């Protein structure tokens, strides 16, 4: 199936890394295992500071679903278990042993039964790689998905491409073969053919995949690479019984690597990007999963008060300035550095804005079609917070047929019945990144949707055994 997305916004941001290769490998002294994505679920920590661990060691367990573990991908020593507000678990910091873990595992994918395969996924931390719709929560082992979607079309700003992720391996062919094994494992685990969504320019091993997966291509501006867009156009979620699991290309590589090579894939490709980074520092690196920012960034950038440190892309990433020793998030492959101006732009309301980005034609640039211009973005809001406006401008950048303003209003009043009627079950917070970005009222739609999905999920599916 070929999907063409017309709505969205092609964000051309300054600060992208150079496309010409990599700038080496970095073996960080410290890494962390990010537990923030599991906030909707109560976790039981299985380690203490000072414990020696190896790749595959269980670090935390789902309390409500015993036997599902979050595991380490490196060898080392547990240094700290960090907690936030109300003692919520944030991450587990590990002092990493130099080099790649040599802890070996022996699993024969073809010999394992479906039940045995599920136990392997739960024990080795592979099940925690899946996310579940509705609600955009960690996948639950008690749920049987209607479909599984594998995303090879991620086009968030500065996010490394599929080709960049394949640089982890000796050849592109080797990387694709590992991916095929991962897809085979997913197909066997759930007894279905997953949906693989990629871009036209990718040369996938079609002959190896066609028997175990449905292949689709998608084209269009961001958010054409969002899983919500893929699900909406291929197999839409109609009610809360339509369970769909989603997983990224990189996470499928982790699954395939364990079954084919017998080792945890402890490395990842990271993009260092953002207009606050000097051009010479904008690059791709191969480093350990969850690497410390301090090991990846120049000291003058890491310690600067004039920049914003973001784990992830500039639209959906986590702001890390207030963290003592920030590390990459669980699903993040980008570190974004943006300017953090301390003063307002002089007479900004009187400027013509020829080089300003606008969707609402606030500036002169909105009235002319020009060649691609790269925008130099910073963290200024360019105005104060105002009441939300009921406008169709949000739908211009939304790739799914969900009325943005009415849905946000329903969520703010906790009218979940109305919110579900408007499409809450289909969405994730990422779907509101662009509406938040262009919103004249400065409403934090991303945060509103995220909190509402967690709250509604706790009332409906996240109940203890």
Swiss-Prot record:
Keywords: Ion transport, NAD, Sodium, Sodium transport, Translocase, Transport, Ubiquinone
Record keyword NAD present: yes
Catalysed reaction, written as an equation: a ubiquinone + n Na(+)(in) + NADH + H(+) = a ubiquinol + n Na(+)(out) + NAD(+)
UniProt-listed GO biological process terms: sodium ion transport
Molecular function GO terms recorded: oxidoreductase activity, acting on NAD(P)H, quinone or similar compound as acceptor
EC number(s) from the headed UniProt entry: 7.2.1.1
One Pfam family per UniProt: NQRA_2nd
Family: Belongs to the NqrA family.
PANTHER family assigned to the protein according to its UniProt record, in alphabetical order: NA(+)-TRANSLOCATING NADH-QUINONE REDUCTASE SUBUNIT A (PTHR37839:SF1)
Role, per record: NQR complex catalyzes the reduction of ubiquinone-1 to ubiquinol by two successive reactions, coupled with the transport of Na(+) ions from the cytoplasm to the periplasm. NqrA to NqrE are probably involved in the second step, the conversion of ubisemiquinone to ubiquinol.
Subunit structure as annotated in this protein's UniProt entry: Composed of six subunits; NqrA, NqrB, NqrC, NqrD, NqrE and NqrF.
Protein name stated in the entry: Na(+)-translocating NADH-quinone reductase subunit A
Organism (species): Chlamydia muridarum (strain MoPn / Nigg)
Gene from which this protein is expressed: nqrA
């Amino acid at each position: 199936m070929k999907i063409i997305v017309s709505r969205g916004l092609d964000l051309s941001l300054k600060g992208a890394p150079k496309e010409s290769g990599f700038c080496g490998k970095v073996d960080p002294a410290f890494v962390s295992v990010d537990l923030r994505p599991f906030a909707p679920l109560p976790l039981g920590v299985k380690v203490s500071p000072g414990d020696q661990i190896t790749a595959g060691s269980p670090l935390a367990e789902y309390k409500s679903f015993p036997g599902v573990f979050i595991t380490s991908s490196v060898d080392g020593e547990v240094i700290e278990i960090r907690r936030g507000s109300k003692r919520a678990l944030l991450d587990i910091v590990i002092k990493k042993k130099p080099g790649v873990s040599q802890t070996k595992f022996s699993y024969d994918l073809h010999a394992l039964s479906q039940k045995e395969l599920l136990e392997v996924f739960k024990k080795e931390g592979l099940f925690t790689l899946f996310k579940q719709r509705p609600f955009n929560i960690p996948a639950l082992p008690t749920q049987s998905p209607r479909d599984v979607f594998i995303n090879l079309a991620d086009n968030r700003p500065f996010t490394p491409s599929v080709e960049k992720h394949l640089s982890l391996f000796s050849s592109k062919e080797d990387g694709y073969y590992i991916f095929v094994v991962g897809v085979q494992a997913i197909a066997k685990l759930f007894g279905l053919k997953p949906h693989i969504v990629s871009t036209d320019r990718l040369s996938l091993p079609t002959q190896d995949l066609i028997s175990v997966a449905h292949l689709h291509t998608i084209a269009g501006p961001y958010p054409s690479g969002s899983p919500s867009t893929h699900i909406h156009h291929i197999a839409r979620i109609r009610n809360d019984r339509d369970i769909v699991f989603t997983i990224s290309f990189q996470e499928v590589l982790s699954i395939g690597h364990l079954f084919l090579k017998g080792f945890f894939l402890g490395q990842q490709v990271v993009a260092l990007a953002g207009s606050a980074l000097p051009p010479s520092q904008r690059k791709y690196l191969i480093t350990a999963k969850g690497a410390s920012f301090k090991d990846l960034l120049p000291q003058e950038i890491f310690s600067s008060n004039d920049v914003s440190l973001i784990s992830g892309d500039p639209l959906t990433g986590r702001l890390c300035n207030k963290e003592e020793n920030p590390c990459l998030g669980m699903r993040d492959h980008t570190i974004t550095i943006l300017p953090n101006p301390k003063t307002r732009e002089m007479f900004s309301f009187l400027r013509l804005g020829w080089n300003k980005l606008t969707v609402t034609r606030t500036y002169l640039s909105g009235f002319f079609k020009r060649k691609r211009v790269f925008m130099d973005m910073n963290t200024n809001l360019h105005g104060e917070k105002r009441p939300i406006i009921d406008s169709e401008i949000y739908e211009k950048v939304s790739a799914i047929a969900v009325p943005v303003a009415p849905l946000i209003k329903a969520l703010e009043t906790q009218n979940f019945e109305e919110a579900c009627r408007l499409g809450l079950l289909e969405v994730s917070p990422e779907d509101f990144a662009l509406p938040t970005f262009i919103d004249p009222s400065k409403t934090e739609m991303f945060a509103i949707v995220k909190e509402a999905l967690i709250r509604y999920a706790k009332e409906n599916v996240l109940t203890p055994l």
